[in-house]
Regions:
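C-terminal and inter-domain tail/linker signature
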Residues: 1-133
Length: 133
């Protein structure tokens, strides 16, 4: 049985947590778009395709030693998956451990991530998924 959308998103998070850029990129479509909310320090803007995703992930590893997202929820919303996570990492310059809550909404098509968007609140993410009603 092919993986479901939640499994695909989980695999992508596992890859990023491991720092495995090749594995992370294998989960995305060539024309994938990720819109960063700025919830992650230093990560704001739109990142396109495999190179954009690599740039985003590499930025995390430039800012933090061993960045990690502890996923607490993966909510299946049809072709979308809402992720709630607590991210953490030790600042490379400051040495200070940072943690922050984060939410992303992922769209999956044909077994690949085609769009992702970060949010600074669960309410915003639920509204974007049409689940706030």
């Amino acid at each position: 049985m092919p993986p479901n959308n939640v499994d695909i998103v989980r695999e992508a998070y596992d890859a990023v947590n491991l720092g495995d850029l090749d594995m992370a990129v294998s989960c995305i479509a060539p024309d994938m778009e990720y819109v960063a909310s700025g919830a992650v320090p230093g990560a704001t803007g739109v990142f396109m395709g495999p190179e954009g995703v690599k740039e985003f992930i590499a930025g995390l590893y430039e800012e933090f030693d061993e960045p990690h997202a502890d996923v607490s929820e993966l909510l299946d919303a049809g072709d979308q998956v809402l992720v709630s996570a607590t991210a953490r990492g030790r600042g490379k310059l400051s040495g200070v451990e940072a943690t922050w809550d984060t939410w992303q909404l992922w769209t999956v098509r044909d077994g690949k991530l085609v769009r992702g968007q970060g949010f600074t609140s669960r309410e915003e993410a639920l509204a974007a998924a049409g689940l706030d009603r």
